[in-house]
Amino acid sequence: MAPLNTYTSTEVLLLDNACNDVHELGRALWSITVDRYHHRDEWTLTCLAEAHGRWDMTYRLVSIQNATTIGQLLAAERLVESPKDASDEDNIFAFATTGSRLPVRTLLGRSSFILQLSEFDGRPTAQVLFSGANNKGQARILLNVFHSLWETHGSSPLNAERPVCEVGGLSYEDVRILELVNSGRLAQQQECIHDVVLQHALQAPTQHAVRAWDGNLTYHQLNDHADRIATMLVSAGIGPGDFIPSIMEKSYWTIVVILATLKAGAVFVPIDPKCPASRINGIFLQVWPKVYFTNLGPQMRRKLNPSVACVDNFAEIVQQVQPGPLPPSRPDAIATCFFTSGSTGKPKGAIHDHSAIATGIVDLLGPFHMDSRTSSMHFVSPSFDVSVTEIAATLYAGGCICVPSEQGKLNDLNGQMRALGVTHAFLTPSVACQVKPSEVPTLQYIMLGGEPLGRATLEALCEDVHLINVYGSTESGLWDTASERLTLQSKPSNIGRSTGPRMWIVHPGNPGNLLPFGTVGEVMVESHCLARGYIGNQPAKTGFVPAPEWRHQLFPGMEQGRFYLTGDLGSYNPDGSIMLHGRKDTQAKIRGQRIELGEIEHQFKAALPTSRVVAEVVTIGSRTMLAAFVELSTAEDKTDIEPSVCVDSLSIRTAQAARLGATPALSAALPVYMVPEMYIPVNSIPLTMSGKTDRRRLRELASTITTVQLEMINGVDDEKEQPRNERERLIQATWAAVLQRKASTIGIHDHFFKIGGDSLSAMKVVAAARSRQLVINVGDILGHPTIASLAEFLSSSSTISYATKGMANRDIQVTVTVL
């Protein structure tokens, strides 16, 4: 704990005399200030009052929700003793009152901020005391916000019925700075991506547009193939406004059908081919397609709606159909519909017009250093919005899209990137940490997004390749912000400055309340790049909002775009970049893929109607995963139960029974990345003071799970049979290196995915095994997830040779040698 003499003070501000009780007003406004600094569901305010040279210390439990009033805030429960969870908070916030400049002689511990309210010449004064040299900027922001609130509300009586979320306090300086950081013009491109591709085909017909595992296409070939398939669509009665789903594994044909759909005037609807058939059919019911594209086998097709025609004979169409008249381009027409997880249990489709996509692309070409020399890797499924950047932005720039095979990117990511000549890659930090720039000499830029950036990834790559931290949402279509080149001194949560949109920070419960510069609030995007909304105008929980009143009143000279509330909490840094602080709702991301935890819990209620199960993304050790917390207690009143993870045999059996009961139903309704990997038994689901699920506490509980407890929960055998031969010892050593544990703690019958492994760590195993002259692939691990079974499989396998279509339209022999 830090004694007071390590504290530093901000300047002292002289406040106007208030018509309210000074101490009561100060505590209320300081509580609001702190809430806008971190936006926790509940926290502890340490209150210090001086009398006769001595200090009295009490505590207030503060919980500010959307409906919380000033009166409720002032009546916050007072405690004489510190709550048991007070020491768990990231920062200590205190409010001190004294009749003089008497210093606060107390120990508050850790990083602390104390608002000291004093008096000078009959007028109140305020200063913020803070510990830690790095907290000066935050302390000044806190003092400025408090001062703005005092100036706005101190001269009139406090309205006890007024909701806290309506309490504003912008200073003239805040307005000036916000206008400065958002002063750029909102551009709007009136063009279509397929028209830009046509221009490239005319001006540079022989330049590579696609370099894929199954073949290459020049811009002339790409445009010609797309024209022929679009002509077929038009002749089949497909026209403007028709939705065409595409359920395809990555291939150069994937790029062709995207352009063909747009040229026909239709709407491209990408669907992940790994989705269960029930989810695909559910999307069909929302878009009512006449046809869909696929390159999947007949087994999947038989499960889909038979009334929708299937188009899969792309090569035959290109050979037999001559290009014909196509509908005129309309930049205001809908171009794409990306489906994402919905909180009501039903996926929702965000629709973008051509102009929005083109506008977003033009905004980011400069920050991402993309031009005709760009070779961008198409890594993600086309169903994810990142693919717009990978595909559309690359084509707009006149560059080349590099398409690795699915198995190739899993088993030899660096080799695939090297063979394709990749210069740009858009990756999640989890995947990026597997990239070795020394093995990919062409690689220049990696854009990191989709999940929080960790310092390990930053340190591993920033000196060898140009790293850019990026941020955006499905509703934005592309990226909203991008950082400068990351260095070892960069903060991973800094997402950089706007690439074009205006970025506003508003109150999480009231977008009509623009927050002071530097405080934490919900990130709101204003742009012409935004989606028009969701298909079917789904009104529930939409983030699309009309222009707030402050937008016209404070910034009347700025042209206006559309507005979207992201649900992300952020704050402005002094240089105009933005720092992220988590989410305000139940939306989460796992390995770059957006999920609504509410949609998963909706399925749990149907599958396990008598159980309470909460889904949450947690981190255990170095691994982030989607977990299901299974509540064991059936008591009505659980207030006296201290939530904890239960690892006794009965609790574990109960959680495993929940897994067995729910997994089939979840797997049939949700994509595989939305099915929990782990079921954690807890005696009680923790709640906040307001009665909501305390997700922060759940994440903390999960973080305390040890390796031994993890294996107990996953049903891993205590007995660890050790390797019997050299091959098993090699595999054990490889697993141990990747999972960061002692080799002796892994038995030959332990299941890889129950001892901390996942698909990403399986990719790492493949790479690590290669350095040990052991050649395996991810499919081998999936099919043989124990050391014993994998070693036996490798022993029984012979040398396999197969042909695949190479990077230059020639057959390449690939040999897998089994040691």
UniProtKB/Swiss-Prot annotation:
Pfam families in alphabetical order: AMP-binding, PP-binding
Expression induction: Expression is positively regulated by the cluster-specific transcription factor FGM4 and is induced during infection of coleoptiles of wheat seedlings. Expression is also up-regulated during infection of barley. The fusaoctaxin A gene cluster is silenced by H3K27 trimethylation by the histone methyltransferase KMT6.
Gene3D superfamilies: 3.30.300.30, ACP-like (1.10.1200.10), N-terminal domain of ligase-like (3.40.50.12780)
One GO biological process term: amino acid activation for nonribosomal peptide biosynthetic process
Effect of disrupting the coding gene: Leads to reduced virulence.
E.C. number(s) listed in UniProt: 6.3.2.-
InterPro entries: ACP-like_sf, AMP-bd_C_sf, AMP-dep_synth/lig_dom, ANL_N_sf, PKS_PP-bd, PP-bd_ACP, Ppantetheine_attach_site
Pathway recorded for this protein: Secondary metabolite biosynthesis
Protein origin, superkingdom: Eukaryota
Ranges where the Carrier domain occurs: 722-798
Coiled coil: none
Class of the enzyme per the UniProt entry, highest EC level: ligase
UniProt keyword list: Ligase, Phosphopantetheine, Phosphoprotein, Repeat, Virulence
Region described as Adenylation (A) domain: spans on this chain: 202-591
Family, as annotated: Belongs to the NRP synthetase family.
Functional description taken from the UniProt entry: Nonribosomal peptide synthetase; part of the Fg3_54/C64 gene cluster that mediates the biosynthesis of the octapeptide fusaoctaxin A, a virulence factor that is required for cell-to-cell invasiveness of plant host. The 2 nonribosomal peptide synthetases NRPS9 and NRPS5 form an assembly line which likely utilizes GABA as a starter unit (loaded on the unique module M1 of NRPS9) and sequentially incorporates seven extender units composed of the residues L-Ala, L-allo-Ile, L-Ser, L-Val, L-Ser, L-Leu and L-Leu, respectively.
Protein name listed in UniProt: Nonribosomal peptide synthetase 9
Organism for this UniProt entry: Gibberella zeae (strain ATCC MYA-4620 / CBS 123657 / FGSC 9075 / NRRL 31084 / PH-1) (Wheat head blight fungus)
